[in-house]
C-alpha cells in the first residue's frame, strides 16, 4: 500500500496565559484518557528530562489498539513534538508551540505531518483534500474539547487557596 504525507497546520486561540497553557498541555499522565473522543487508557514513561513515551490503548470498533508516541518537550520555546512510533500513523510527527497573545491569552500553533497508508496512489489534489480534512478534524478537536477544557481547568478554584498540581487541575480535559 502506498503512503501519503499529509501536511497541514492550524492555530487555536487559548483563554490562558502562555506559561500556564504550556504547562497544562505538556502535563501528560494516566488521567488523560477522558480527553479523547473514544475510550483511551494512557501510560507515560519518562526517558529523560523533556523526553517521554506515551502509550495509549484505544478501542476503535471494540478492538484493542496500542499507539506509542515519543514526545520531546522544549520549555524554552514552549513547544513539543509528538512522533508516532507505531499504530496507524507510524512515523507521523506533530509539532506544537504555545505563543503569548497578551498577558492573559495565548495561541497554539500546530504543524502536522501525518503519514497514512492508502489503497492506491493519489493525485496531488487528492492528497491536498485529505490533508485539509485531517487539519479540520484536528483543529476541530482542539476547538471543541481541549481549548475549553484548558480554560475550565485553569479557572477552577484551588482548594483552600493553595496551588493545585496540574494533574488535579486537568480533571478530564476534553480531546487531542
Which ranges hold each PLM region?
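Hydrophobic ligand-binding cavity/cleft-lining segments
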Residues: 1-49, 176
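Short structured motifs
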Residues: 7-8, 38-40, 52-55, 79-81, ...
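A generic structural signal for alpha-helix starts
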Residues: 15-19, 89, 137
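Hydrophobic pocket/interface hotspot
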Residues: 20-25, 70-71, 108-110, 142
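Conserved short hydrophobic interaction patches
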Residues: 27-31, 74, 145, 149
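Hydrophobic-ligand binding "helix-grip"
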Residues: 34, 59-109, 113-117, 171-176
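Short, well-structured hydrophobic secondary-structure segments
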Residues: 46-62
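A conserved amphipathic terminal alpha-helix motif
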Residues: 113-176
Amino acid at each position: 500500500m502506498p503512503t501519503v504525507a499529509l501536511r497541514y497546520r492550524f492555530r487555536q486561540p487559548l483563554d490562558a496565559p502562555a506559561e500556564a497553557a504550556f504547562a497544562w498541555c505538556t502535563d501528560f499522565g494516566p488521567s488523560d484518557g477522558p480527553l479523547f473522543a473514544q475510550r483511551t487508557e494512557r501510560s507515560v514513561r519518562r526517558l529523560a528530562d523533556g523526553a517521554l513515551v506515551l502509550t495509549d490503548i484505544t478501542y476503535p470498533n471494540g478492538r484493542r489498539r496500542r499507539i506509542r508516541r515519543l514526545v520531546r518537550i522544549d520549555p524554552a520555546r514552549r513547544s513539543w513534538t509528538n512522533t508516532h512510533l507505531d499504530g496507524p500513523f507510524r512515523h507521523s510527527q506533530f509539532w506544537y508551540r504555545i505563543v503569548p497573545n497578551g498577558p492573559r491569552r495565548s495561541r497554539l500553533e500546530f504543524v502536522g505531518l501525518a503519514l497514512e497508508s492508502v489503497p492506491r496512489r493519489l493525485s496531488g489534489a487528492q492528497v491536498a483534500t485529505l490533508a485539509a480534512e485531517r487539519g479540520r478534524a484536528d483543529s476541530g478537536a482542539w476547538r471543541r474539547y481541549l481549548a475549553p477544557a484548558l480554560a475550565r481547568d485553569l479557572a477552577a478554584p484551588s482548594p483552600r487557596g493553595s496551588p493545585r498540581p496540574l494533574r488535579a487541575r486537568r480533571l478530564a480535559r476534553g480531546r487531542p
